């Protein structure tokens, strides 16, 4: 008998979690925060808190805020140039922005480099097609609900639904396969409806 693929297993778990079949912060995986085995925590629609008011100055020196993307599904990724897993996942995040941008998905980075030049070099090396806040002190991280994600390690990623609510988070690196599954479920939710309206096929 053919074994289900990793993508199929993750898709089923994500859909169940986002549809409200699990607890507000139930871990779908319990491995260490590694690029290959991230820890994903989902939030039931009815239990989702407002997303933090991430805002500040981008690496390009321009104002940038999460509030400017209300009505879109936003992937907020915390990274630094010295972080190996951050380098590993950057191409996947870039592809997701280009692939799903016209469907209402936006990727927004939060960079933790002390030196702005290092962050800009990383941005150039990977030709990132999305903006990042420069947050050398990590103050943006403290805006997240306690226990949602491990803010002491990088990378981590949080997902914001169209209503501006926190839908889930990943501690550790995330793959394009994982992003497709999570975002596919969120894109099928109605803005402000508080429920997943379809399951992924």
Predicted features, each with a name:
Residues 1-53, 193-201:
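N-terminal targeting signals for export/organelle localization
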Residues 45-48, 53-74:
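A short beta-strand-turn-helix
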Residues 64-87, 93:
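Short active-site neighborhood of thiol/selenol oxidoreductases, capturing the structured segment around
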């Amino acid at each position: 008998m053919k074994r289900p693929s990793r993508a199929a297993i993750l898709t089923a778990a994500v859909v169940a979690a986002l549809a409200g079949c699990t607890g507000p912060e139930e871990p779908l995986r319990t491995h260490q925060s590694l690029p290959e085995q991230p820890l994903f925590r989902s939030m039931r629609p009815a239990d989702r808190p407002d997303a933090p008011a991430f805002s500040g100055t981008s690496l390009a020196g321009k104002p940038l805020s999460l509030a400017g993307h209300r009505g879109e599904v936003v992937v907020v990724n915390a990274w630094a140039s010295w972080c190996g897993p951050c380098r590993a996942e950057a191409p996947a995040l870039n592809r997701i922005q280009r692939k799903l941008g016209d469907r209402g998905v936006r990727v927004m980075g939060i960079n933790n480099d002390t030196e702005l030049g290092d962050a800009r070099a990383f941005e150039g090396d990977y030709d990132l097609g999305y903006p990042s806040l420069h947050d050398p002190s990590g103050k943006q991280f403290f805006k997240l609900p306690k226990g949602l994600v491990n803010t002491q390690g990088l990378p981590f990623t949080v997902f914001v639904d169209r209503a501006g609510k926190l839908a889930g988070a990943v501690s550790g690196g995330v793959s394009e396969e994982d992003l497709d599954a999570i975002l596919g479920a969120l894109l099928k939710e109605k803005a402000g409806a508080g429920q997943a309206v379809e399951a992924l096929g």
